[in-house]
């Protein structure tokens, strides 16, 4: 049986539920979207393509909510589903998501194994050969990421990763020469080549390759590749070439603003701010950092906020604006209280207080009253009213106690002060006021509230064997096994099902460790 067709009628109810979940996610209602997706899996479907898509969205919403282990688990479910039905493009995308998530979680060996597995999967299947170029590019990217993150402390192992990357790039070039269908973009190849040369400390060759990539991308109107090439060229240049680094970052920001994503613009502004600070261009660095901070809060890109706050604080100290710097130092200290970077913020408050002491008369107390005026979104009254005293910066342990005190004070409920000579409230006025308010609420409901209602499942709540093996699968498992599937993937799924009887009920604990993470799609070579 051709698995591109499914046994049974099209599952219109599950599709309607999925559209409802996606709508909620697009409105920023991620918890609601997550709940709707869980309802779909509880409802169940026999449409394998649809179920793979459901897994993909569930993984994405978990990733957004920082439920990393659960996101990784469902990206693996997604990959298994698409590999079962020989959907090679989706299998490539699923593997890329798994690799990105695994690298985010610091699981380099897992990312590498999945990338290698994709090469095996595509090269051993007749209809998958045209996707092997994408698989090799992904594997090369993983090797470079591992080399860049110093996951291998042994220099010989790092050299081995670079050698593997070079081999994969050469294989992709050969693939492109012999295949027009599925050929990998030349700009992707050149970007990887240039990065490989940079990490191998062949800087002159790397610069030439990046420039070649930029010229080719402009000529072929691939402007997204232009800003990536400029950024990478700056990122991997020798650290003493500040003038050229800043120039390339400006070019990257220019092209990203016109042709890139908002996330790219934030990343480039953050990096440009750091390098301009290093070059002594304090005020311009401060302005770029402040712009990046506003965008970070708007887009929820919290992975950048600590670095940006630290850069802004350093710029303000260099400009002699210590009261304003203290505000950003406290913000950063609160955010990084349990992280290694907390010490970096302590070092800055120590610098600021020492400067303040040198400019304060001996008969006066050394202190800094917080000035939050540069922050357009400042609304934290607890921090705004705080005064940093010299004793607070005695050492990092003392500063940690002070910051923990601020955090504890923020958690306390705000006391409502009773106004003096306050007249008693007239009961009839209160009733009319509440009635009018309710009328306004009934007539001015926001459009976002009118999301399509969640369809109610009429399916049995009993968990079937198929549902335990793949959450949301409602099918006769004996009949499913008779269909034309990828046998190796099927065997892996069945093997795992014997080890775990987990079903959708296990998703109640969304942040638990994925104990099955290394035993999902591995194949023996």
From Swiss-Prot:
Task: Give GO MF terms, alphabetically.
Answer: G-protein alpha-subunit binding; GDP-dissociation inhibitor activity
Keywords, A to Z, come to: Cell cycle, Cell division, Cytoplasm, Cytoskeleton, Mitosis
List each copy of the GoLoco domain by range. 424-445
Q: What are the boundaries of the region Disordered?
A: 488-525
Keyword hit for Acyltransferase: no
Q: Tell me where it resides.
A: Cytoplasm, Cell cortex; Cytoplasm, Cytoskeleton, Spindle
Matching SUPFAM superfamilies, A to Z? TPR-like (SSF48452)
Chief site of localization: cytoplasm
- One GO cellular component term, please give it: cell cortex
Q: What is this protein called?
A: G-protein regulator 1
Q: What changes when the gene is disrupted?
A: Simultaneous RNAi-mediated knockdown of both gpr-1 and gpr-2 causes, in the 1-cell embryo, a decrease in nuclear and spindle movements during prophase, reduced asymmetric spindle elongation during anaphase and mispositioning of nuclei after cell division.
């Amino acid at each position: 049986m051709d698995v591109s067709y499914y046994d049974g009628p099209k599952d219109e109810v599950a599709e309607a539920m999925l559209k409802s979940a996606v709508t909620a996610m697009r409105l920023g209602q991620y918890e609601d979207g997550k709940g709707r997706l869980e309802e779909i899996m509880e409802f169940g479907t026999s449409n394998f393509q649809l179920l793979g898509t459901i897994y993909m969205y569930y993984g994405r919403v978990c990733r957004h909510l920082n439920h990393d282990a659960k996101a990784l688990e469902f990206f693996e479910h997604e990959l298994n589903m698409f590999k079962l039905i020989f959907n090679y493009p989706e299998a490539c995308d699923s593997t890329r998501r798994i690799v990105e998530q695994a690298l985010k979680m610091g699981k380099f060996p897992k990312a590498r194994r999945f990338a290698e597995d994709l090469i095996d999967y595509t090269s051993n299947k007749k209809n998958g050969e045209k996707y092997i170029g994408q698989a090799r590019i992904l594997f090369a990217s993983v090797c470079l990421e591992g080399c860049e993150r110093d996951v291998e402390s042994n220099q010989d192992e790092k050299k081995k990763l670079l050698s593997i990357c070079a081999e994969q790039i050469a294989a992709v070039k050969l693939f492109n020469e012999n295949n027009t269908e599925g050929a990998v973009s030349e700009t992707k190849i050149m970007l990887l080549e240039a990065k490989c040369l940079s990490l191998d400390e062949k800087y002159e060759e790397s610069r030439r390759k990046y420039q070649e990539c930029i010229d080719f991308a402009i000529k072929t109107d691939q402007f997204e590749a232009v800003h990536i090439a400029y950024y990478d060229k700056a990122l991997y240049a020798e650290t003493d070439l500040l003038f050229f680094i800043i120039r390339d970052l400006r070019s990257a920001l220019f092209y990203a603003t016109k042709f890139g994503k908002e996330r790219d613009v934030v990343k480039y502004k953050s990096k440009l701010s750091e390098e301009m600070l290093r070059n002594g261009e304090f005020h311009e660095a401060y302005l770029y950092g402040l712009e990046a901070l506003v965008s970070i809060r708007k887009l929820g890109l919290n992975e950048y906020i600590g670095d940006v706050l630290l850069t802004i604080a350093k710029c303000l100290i260099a400009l002699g604006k210590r009261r304003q710097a203290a505000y950003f130092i406290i913000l950063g200290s609160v955010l990084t209280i349990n992280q290694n970077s907390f010490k970096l913020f302590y070092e800055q408050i120590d610098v600021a207080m020492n400067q303040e002491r040198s400019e304060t008369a001996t008969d006066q107390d050394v202190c800094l009253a917080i000035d939050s005026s540069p922050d357009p979104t400042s609304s934290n009254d607890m921090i705004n009213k705080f005064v940093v005293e010299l004793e607070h910066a005695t050492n990092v342990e003392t500063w940690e106690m002070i910051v923990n005190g601020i955090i504890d004070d923020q958690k306390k409920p705000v006391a409502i002060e009773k106004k003096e000579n306050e007249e008693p409230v007239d009961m009839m006025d209160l009733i009319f006021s509440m009635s009018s308010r309710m009328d306004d609420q009934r007539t001015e409901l926001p459009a976002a509230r009118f999301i399509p209602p969640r369809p109610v499942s009429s399916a049995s709540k009993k968990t079937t064997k198929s549902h335990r093996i793949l959450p949301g699968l409602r099918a006769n498992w004996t009949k499913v096994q008779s269909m034309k599937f990828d046998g190796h993937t099927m065997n892996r799924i069945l093997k795992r099902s014997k080890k775990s009887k987990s079903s959708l009920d296990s998703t109640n604990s969304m942040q638990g460790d994925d104990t099955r993470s290394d035993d999902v799609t591995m194949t023996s070579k």
